[in-house]
Amino acid sequence: MQYKKTLVASALAATTLAAYAPSEPWSTLTPTATYSGGVTDYASTFGIAVQPISTTSSASSAATTASSKAKRAASQIGDGQVQAATTTASVSTKSSAAAVSQIGDGQIQATTKTTAAAVSRDGQIQATTKTTSAKTTAAAVSQIGDGQIQATTTTLAPKSTAAAVSQMGDGQIQATTKTTAAAVSQIGDGQVQATTKTTAAAVSQIGDGQVQATTKTTAAAVSQITDGQVQATTKTTQAASQVSDGQVQATSATSASAAATSTDPVDAVSCKTSGTLEMNLKGGILTDGKGRIGSIVANRQFQFDGPPPQAGAIYAAGWSITPDGNLAIGDNDVFYQCLSGTFYNLYDEHIGSQCTPVHLEAIDLIDC
C-alpha cells in the first residue's frame, strides 16, 4: 500500500513538473519573419531608451531623428517586467545618455527626471570640434527584479537624448513618467519600468530583476575654461581635464565600446550606474545582466525571466537591432507603452486605450 502511494505521489510530481516545462525548446519560440538588415549579434552590452512614436506616422517607418523625438529609458523591475515612466521631459542631442538601472525582479523602469549639462562661469556652453562619431545621449533604462519593463506616463518636448530604462528584480521593465530622458531601472523580478519623468534620470535595478529609472538623469559632463565658457566633450567615456590656465578640456580618447562605427547601428550612449539594465544580444536571444531571457509573455508584455522563460511565453528568441538602432522582435520594431498606475508597461501589441506606440532605442553603456 505504501509502495502504491509512493508511485502515485511520484506520478503527480512528474505531472506537475511537466506542466511548467515548455511544450518545445524555448529557443525556437521565435517569430516567422525577421527584420530586414537587423543585427542579431551585438558585440557589447547595451541598454534601451523609450522613444515615443508620432501617431500620425506609420508604425514601421516612424522613428528616428534624435533631435525630433523625445526618448525615455525603460526601467526594469526585479520580476523582469519592463516599464516606462509616465512623464517625459525634453532631451538634448548630446553624445552621452543616462544609464538604465535594473531591479531584482527584472522589471525595467525609467527615472522621473533628468539633469542638464553643467554650465561654465560665463554661462556659455560649447561642444567639442568632433561630432562625426559622437553618439546621441539617451537616458539609461533601469531593471526591477521581476524583469518587467515599463515606460513613464508623460511626454514633454522630444529631443535626441533618451531616458534610461530601469529593471526590477522580477525582470519587468518600466519607463519614467517624463520624456526628458529619464533613466530606466530594473527591479528584481525582471520587470522594466520607466520613472515618472523622462528627464534622463538614471536607471537602477532592484533585486527581483525589475528595472526602474531614477528620478533624475545627468547629462554628459561639460568642461570649463578660465573665461567661464563650458565645453562638452565629444564622448562621455573620458573625464574632463584641466589646463594650468584654468581651462577644462575633455580628453580626445574614447572607449572602444562606445565609439560609433559605420556598421554600428547604435548611435547613443548612456552612463552606467549601479542597477543599470544591461542586455546582451547573441544569436537573436536577448538576455539581461542576470542571464534571464528577454521574452514576450502570454499577455504580450516584454520582460525577462528564467531561463527558461516564463511558461506560456510567445517569443523568447528572434530579437535584433534594426539599422535605425531600435530593438525589434521578428520584423516588428514598434512596441507599446500602456499606462499602469504611475508607470507604463511595455508590450509588443496594442492592448488597450491607454497604450501609445514607442521605439526601444538601443544605447551603449559606459562607465562615467
Swiss-Prot record:
Site annotation (Cleavage) points to 72-73
For this UniProt record, the keywords arranged alphabetically read as follows:
Cell wall, Cell wall biogenesis/degradation, Cleavage on pair of basic residues, Glycoprotein, Repeat, Secreted, Signal, Stress response
What are the start and end residues of each PIR1/2/3 repeat? 71-89, 97-113, 114-132, 138-156, 162-180, 181-199, 200-218, 219-236, 237-255
Proregion residues are 19-72
Q: Which InterPro entries match?
A: PIR1-like_C, Yeast_CWMannoprotein_PIR, Yeast_PIR_rpt
Q: How is it modified after translation?
A: Covalently linked to beta-1,3-glucan of the inner cell wall layer via an alkali-sensitive ester linkage between the gamma-carboxyl group of glutamic acids, arising from specific glutamines within the PIR1/2/3 repeats, and hydroxyl groups of glucoses of beta-1,3-glucan chains. The propeptide is cleaved off in the late Golgi. While both peptides are secreted, only a fraction of the mature glycoprotein is incorporated into the cell wall.
One Gene Ontology MF term: structural constituent of cell wall
**Pfam families tied to this protein:** PIR, PIR1-like_C
- Recorded GO CC terms: extracellular region; fungal-type cell wall
Name the residues annotated as site: Covalent attachment to cell wall glycan.
81, 107, 124, 148, 172, 191, 210, 229, 247
Record's signal peptide: 1-18
Q: Localized where?
A: Secreted, Cell wall
Q: What's an example Gene Ontology biological process for this entry?
A: fungal-type cell wall organization
Query: Where would you say this protein principally sits, based on its record?
Result: secreted
- Known role: Component of the outer cell wall layer. Required for stability of the cell wall and for optimal growth. Required for resistance against several antifungal and cell wall-perturbing agents and for tolerance to heat shock.
Instruction: State the similarity comment.
Output: Belongs to the PIR protein family.
Per the record, the domain comment is: The PIR1/2/3 repeats are required for the covalent linkage to the cell wall. Their number varies among different strains of S.cerevisiae.
The protein depicted here goes by the name Cell wall mannoprotein HSP150
- Taxonomic path: Eukaryota, Fungi, Dikarya, Ascomycota, Saccharomycotina
Gene that this polypeptide is encoded by = HSP150
